[in-house]
């Protein structure tokens, strides 16, 4: 026999508020949770603002802040005092699922070269193998490999030591990395140095390398790979082989095969005495690179300088080379290939061999659309200068019916024509996986109290512990600048830093009877797929939609914009061999491309030009598109 206990309503309410983790069903599958959490509030807000009863978009609602009710109340109060919030930043970031870089304090550790490190990460490394005497090898194998949001500083490696120095891998395969390397093999006498791999395959890197093999005597130094196949971000290399005496240096590859990288190399082999210097490849095969090389071999005495390739086969972008072997005394300088672009960019070469004392200078190939401001006319020899479209350029472009079909800078399947969206079509699918760090929205009440303007970057740096020239500072500045950019012709845009703001923007453009869609998952990425059944949204008619794309920021931030004259489709994605459904994709086709730039990746991949063709693309993981409900 069970005894029924009757409690007054006020006692029940008291119990509810005293148990923040108490589960209360607020209706429907997947809606179980505390209604006083940010997610509970978002679910209620969706019901209030959206006028239809279609299934809820859990891929959006699950991006709500994971704060529980007690944490929500605490941080809502704390954010009113930003000084108090910044003292508890890392607890806040952990609880709210934000992206915050670690605070690294300077390390006073010193390690001799007899210690051979295999792996090392997430610390400032002050001193390795400095002033080590005698013969031997300093070996450092892996530093900060494959990390997510790593912040590392390596201050000094092998300074003043005659030993051979080897550094295998530094910050490769990292995501949103902030790395600085201060000094490598400086002031050494004899010995050889080899740095194999620095920040290869990094996504959105912020790289600073201050000094490599400066003031060395004799010896051979080799830097093999610097930031190869990196995506977005910026990199800076300040000095290589400066003030060397009879030292030989070789830099094999810098910033090759990159996508939208900003690259600055300040000084290579300045005021070196004798020795052979060789730079094999800089910025080869880049997509929209911004390359700046300030000074190569200036003030050298009897140097032998060779620069093999600069910006060869790159796609648009801008490049500057300021000085090459300026004020050199005798010696020989050879520059083999500059600016042989696939698609023309802007190339400026300021001075070559100026002020030199009887240098022997050869310049082999200089590309199209370049500006050469000053060179030594008496001693410089130009083998080949292209002032029109070059044969090399033409050989890289296959033209078929006026269409460029060489699309090696654009991933296969990233852009396609509308006619491809038919059942039975086999086509490549790009990598639609989300590469950004996982984050959640902030609750609207908290996000609204944080600064959100380029004029408030100093305050944001303080809140998020962002140092000067750090990745976090750059990330915040880039995001806010894009948010404040004037809209393109016909575009309505807004950056939304809460799910509620996204709902408000979408409904302000499309009305309250809306549906938000995304591609179901990432299956089929990087391979061939077969198109199954296809459904045109709004009857397949030209309509308008709101698309929202992630932006890199400490908390989840979306750039949402309404683009007129589009058609939106849903399509089953099949395995091309088994014909089994593996995914359900959402694609958007832009009918009017007249305002797009002629160098847009879609035209590189598909041919034609602005306003001449429609262009379609898939909605990538964690991006989404809104449309009026059918």
Curated annotation (Swiss-Prot):
Residues 1-27 form the signal peptide. Induction: Transiently repressed by ethylene. Coiled coil: none annotated. Residues 415-629 form the BURP domain. One of its GO terms (cellular component) is apoplast. It comes from the Eukaryota. Pfam families: BURP. Glycans are attached at residues 124, 142, 256, 334, 369, 387. It is found in: Secreted, Extracellular space, Apoplast; Secreted, Cell wall. Mostly expressed in fruit pericarp. Also detected at low levels in cell wall of roots, leaves and flowers (at protein level). GO terms for biological process: cell wall organization; fruit ripening. The keyword Signal applies. Residues 28-108, 398-630 form a propeptide. Keywords: Apoplast, Cell wall, Cell wall biogenesis/degradation, Fruit ripening, Glycoprotein, Secreted, Signal. Non-catalytic subunit of the polygalacturonase isozyme 1 (PG1). Necessary and sufficient to convert the polygalacturonase from its monomeric form PG2 to its heterodimeric form PG1. Seems to limit the depolymerization and solubilization of cell wall polyuronides mediated by PG2 during ripening, probably by recruiting PG2 to form PG1. Interacts with polygalacturonase-2 (isoenzymes PG2A and PG2B) to form heterodimers called polygalacturonase-1 (PG1). This is Polygalacturonase-1 non-catalytic subunit beta. The gene is GP1.
């Amino acid at each position: 026999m069970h005894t029924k206990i009757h409690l007054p309503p006020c006692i029940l309410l008291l119990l509810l508020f005293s148990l923040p983790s108490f589960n209360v069903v607020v209706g429907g599958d997947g809606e179980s949770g505390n209604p006083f959490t940010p997610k509970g509030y978002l679910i209620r807000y969706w019901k209030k603002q959206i006028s239809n009863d279609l299934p809820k978009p859990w891929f959006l609602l699950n991006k709500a802040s994971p704060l529980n009710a007690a944490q929500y109340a605490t941080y809502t109060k704390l954010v009113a005092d930003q000084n108090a919030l910044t003292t508890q930043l890392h607890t806040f970031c952990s609880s709210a699922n934000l992206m915050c870089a670690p605070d690294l304090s300077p390390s006073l550790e010193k390690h001799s070269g007899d210690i051979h490190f295999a792996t090392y990460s997430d610390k400032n490394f002050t001193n390795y193998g400095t002033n080590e005497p005698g013969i031997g090898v300093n070996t450092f194998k892996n530093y900060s490999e494959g990390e997510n949001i790593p912040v590392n500083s390596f201050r000094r490696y092998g300074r003043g030591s005659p030993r051979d120095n080897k550094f295998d891998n530094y910050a490769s395969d990292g995501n949103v990395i902030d790395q600085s390397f201060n000094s490598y093999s400086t002031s050494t006498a004899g010995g050889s140095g080899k740095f194999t791999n620095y920040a290869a395959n990094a996504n959105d890197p912020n790289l600073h390398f201050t000094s490599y093999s400066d003031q060395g005597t004799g010896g051979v130094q080799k830097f093999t790979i610097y930031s190869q196949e990196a995506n977005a971000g910026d990199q800076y290399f300040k000095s290589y082989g400066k003030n060397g005496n009879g030292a030989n240096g070789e830099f094999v590859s810098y910033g090759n095969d990159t996508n939208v990288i900003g690259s600055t190399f300040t000084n290579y082999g300045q005021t070196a005495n004798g020795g052979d210097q060789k730079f094999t490849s800089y910025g080869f095969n880049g997509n929209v690179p911004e390359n700046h090389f300030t000074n190569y071999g200036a003030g050298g005495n009897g140097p032998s300088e060779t620069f093999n390739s600069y910006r060869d086969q790159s796609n648009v972008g801008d490049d500057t080379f300021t000085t090459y072997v300026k004020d050199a005394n005798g010696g020989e300088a050879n520059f083999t290939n500059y600016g042989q672009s696939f698609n023309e960019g802007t190339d400026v070469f300021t001075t070559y061999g100026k002020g030199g004392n009887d240098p022997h200078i050869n310049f082999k190939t200089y590309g199209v659309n370049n500006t050469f401001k000053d060179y030594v006319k008496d001693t410089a020899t130009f083998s080949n200068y292209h002032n029109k479209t070059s044969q090399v350029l033409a050989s890289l472009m296959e033209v078929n019916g006026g269409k460029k079909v060489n699309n090696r800078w654009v991933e296969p399947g990233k852009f396609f024509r509308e006619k491809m969206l038919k059942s039975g079509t086999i086509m490549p699918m790009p990598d639609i996986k989300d590469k950004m760090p996982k984050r959640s929205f902030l609750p609207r009440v908290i996000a609204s109290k944080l600064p959100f303007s380029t004029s408030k970057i100093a305050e944001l740096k303080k809140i998020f512990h962002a140092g000067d020239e750090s990745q976090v500072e750059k990330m915040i500045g880039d995001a806010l600048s894009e948010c404040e950019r004037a809209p393109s012709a016909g575009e309505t845009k807004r950056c939304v830093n809460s799910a509620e703001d996204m709902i408000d923007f979408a409904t302000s453009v499309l009305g309250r009877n809306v549906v938000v869609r995304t591609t179901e998952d990432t299956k089929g990425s990087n391979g061939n797929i077969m198109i199954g059944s296809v459904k045109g949204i709004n009857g397949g008619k030209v309509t308008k939609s709101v698309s929202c794309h992630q932006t890199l920021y400490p908390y989840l931030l979306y750039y949402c914009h309404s683009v007129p004259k589009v058609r939106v489709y849903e399509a089953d994605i099949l395995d091309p061999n088994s014909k089994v459904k593996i995914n359900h994709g959402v694609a958007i086709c832009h009918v009017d491309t007249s305002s797009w730039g002629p160098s847009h990746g879609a035209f590189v991949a598909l041919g034609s030009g602005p306003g001449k063709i429609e262009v379609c693309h898939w909605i990538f993981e964690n991006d989404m598109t809104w449309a009026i409900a059918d």
